[in-house]
Regions:
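Flexible hinge motifs at transmembrane-helix junctions and intramembrane kinks/re-entrant loops
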Residues: 1-6, 88-89, 152
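Membrane-embedded alpha-helical segments and adjacent helix-loop junctions characteristic
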Residues: 3-85
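Hydrophobic alpha-helical transmembrane segments
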Residues: 12, 48-53, 93-94, 128-136
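Non-catalytic, surface-exposed connector residues within folded enzymatic/regulatory domains
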Residues: 14, 68, 72, 92, ...
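Alpha-helical transmembrane segments of multi-pass membrane proteins
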Residues: 47-59, 86-105, 149
Length: 154
């Protein structure tokens, strides 16, 4: 009975997401993505803008792939972004970890969410309604506190 309760789609989604994150890390695609983000924001972008971008991208991705895989993908990108500015990477990394833990708005991003969809009879929009306010609170707290707790420079 325990084996029957395991949803193979959840296992495959999680495994595939981890494989994707590892491939992006191994190929150096994380650095390429970081360079593209910095390039799109212009020369010497404000670290606060990068913090917002990292949070938004991490949060968006984590709601459509495993939060563990998203974190594995985004941490090297966040680190590369901070290093490209000569900034302390701690704020960027912590924002990434928090954003990648905000898998509240879909049933996909976290295995626990996926497991209870059928049990609770939830619809996709139920996750969006409950998850977006939680994400908004996390965003505000991160953007306000992290630069204070871990200044970008000095």
């Amino acid at each position: 009975e325990a084996l029957k309760s395991i949803d193979l789609k959840v296992v495959l989604l999680f495994g595939g997401s981890l494989a994707l994150a590892k491939a992006l890390e191994t190929t150096g695609a994380g650095s390429i993505i970081a360079d593209a983000i910095v390039g799109a924001l212009g020369a010497n972008p404000n670290p606060m803008v990068l913090l917002v971008v990292i949070f938004v991208v991490g949060c968006a991705l984590t709601n459509f792939m495993s939060n563990t895989a998203t974190t594995a993908l985004m941490v090297p990108i966040a680190t590369s972004l901070a290093e490209s500015l000569g900034a302390d990477p701690r704020s960027m990394i912590i924002a990434t970890v928090i954003a990648c833990s905000c898998a509240y708005a879909t049933p996909i991003g976290m295995p626990a969410n996926t497991m209870v969809v059928g049990l609770g009879g939830y619809k996709f929009k139920d996750y969006v309604k409950a998850g977006l306010p939680l994400i908004a609170v996390s965003f505000v707290v991160c953007i306000v506190l992290l630069p204070i707790l871990f200044p970008f420079y000095g």
